[in-house]
């Protein structure tokens, strides 16, 4: 990914993110010359957040609401630079892209890693999962690969039916075209799958973080 547009509004922050920012500022004031062990610091913040009352969290939730309003207001007036591709519209009724074997593996092991290391960031959790997958034997990967292959097969049937709705000839043409360029299509699909999975993982992690905020 290239560098983003510097004029693009800063992303909105969650109540927990504001809390961590405040903790960091407090730590800097108390220990201006001390270096921070980020992993240890994150863990302490996470533990402290979980013991806070709803009233104590209220201040940070108000900050998050105000920041969300600021972000939405700025995005209304933000004009993307020329040449920047807009994200293609996704029909909510379209069949959902199937997860890859790695994504299925991540879904199974992510909660375990988060439970063992509650202070880890989204990026560190993803890195750990990647290392685990790379160190997994081919035989142990097979159940995930078989499940992913079945889901992909089902998706291809579902998407063909979805695209053929209202276009009777499209299904026939689609089958012939798919046979001719199946390899190319699979490569393109795999690339898109990876992008979608990254987005889905981020969304899942953000949702989980927001759930922690609400507790």
Curated annotation (Swiss-Prot):
Record site: Cleavage: 10-11, 67-68
Ranges where the record places region Sufficient for interaction with HAVCR2: 2-97
In-chain residues carrying the UniProt-annotated modification Phosphoserine: 35, 100
Primary residence: nucleus
Region spans: Cytokine-stimulating activity: 89-108
Annotated motif Nuclear localization signal (NLS) 2, positions: 178-184
Residue numbers binding heparin: 2-10
Keywords of the record: Acetylation, Adaptive immunity, ADP-ribosylation, Autophagy, Cell membrane, Chemotaxis, Chromosome, Cytoplasm, Disulfide bond, DNA damage, DNA recombination, DNA repair, DNA-binding, Endosome, Heparin-binding, Immunity, Inflammatory response, Innate immunity, Isopeptide bond, Membrane, Nucleus, Oxidation, Phosphoprotein, Repeat, Secreted
Modified residues (N6-acetyllysine): 3, 7-8, 12, 28-30, 43, 90, 127-128, 141, 172-173, 177, 180, 182-185
Subcellular location: Nucleus; Cytoplasm; Secreted; Chromosome
Disulfide cysteine pairs (residue numbers): 23-45
Location of region: Binding to AGER/RAGE: 150-183
UniProt biased composition (Acidic residues): 187-215
Residue ranges, compositional bias (Basic and acidic residues): 83-94, 161-179
GO biological process: actin cytoskeleton organization; activation of innate immune response; apoptotic cell clearance; autophagy; base-excision repair; cell morphogenesis; cellular response to interleukin-1; cellular response to interleukin-7
Region span, Disordered: 76-95, 161-215
Membrane topology type: Peripheral membrane protein
Modification sites for Cysteine sulfonic acid (-SO3H): 23, 45, 106
Residue range(s) of DNA binding per entry: 9-79, 95-163
Domain commentary: The acidic C-terminal domain forms a flexible structure which can reversibly interact intramolecularily with the HMG boxes and modulate binding to DNA and other proteins.
Function: Multifunctional redox sensitive protein with various roles in different cellular compartments. In the nucleus is one of the major chromatin-associated non-histone proteins and acts as a DNA chaperone involved in replication, transcription, chromatin remodeling, V(D)J recombination, DNA repair and genome stability. Proposed to be an universal biosensor for nucleic acids. Promotes host inflammatory response to sterile and infectious signals and is involved in the coordination and integration of innate and adaptive immune responses.
Protein name, entry field: High mobility group protein B1
């Amino acid at each position: 990914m290239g560098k983003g547009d510097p004029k693009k509004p800063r992303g909105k922050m969650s109540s927990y993110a504001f809390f961590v920012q405040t903790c960091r500022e407090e730590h800097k004031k108390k220990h201006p010359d001390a270096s921070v062990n980020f992993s240890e610091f994150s863990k302490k913040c996470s533990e402290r957040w979980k013991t806070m009352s709803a009233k104590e969290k209220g201040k940070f939730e108000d900050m998050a609401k105000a920041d969300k309003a600021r972000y939405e207001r700025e995005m209304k007036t933000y004009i993307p630079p020329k040449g920047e591709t807009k994200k293609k519209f996704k029909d909510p009724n379209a069949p959902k892209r199937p997860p890859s074997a790695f994504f299925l593996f991540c879904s199974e092991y992510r909660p375990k890693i988060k439970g063992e290391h509650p202070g880890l960031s989204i990026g560190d959790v993803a890195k750990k999962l990647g290392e685990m997958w790379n160190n997994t034997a081919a035989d142990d990967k097979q159940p995930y690969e078989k499940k992913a292959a079945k889901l992909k097969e089902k998706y291809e049937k579902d998407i063909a039916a979805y695209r053929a709705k209202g276009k009777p000839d499209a299904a026939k043409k689609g089958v012939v075209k798919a046979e001719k360029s199946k390899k190319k299509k699979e490569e393109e699909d795999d690339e898109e799958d990876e992008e979608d999975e990254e987005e889905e993982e981020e969304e899942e992690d953000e949702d989980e973080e927001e759930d922690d905020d609400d507790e």
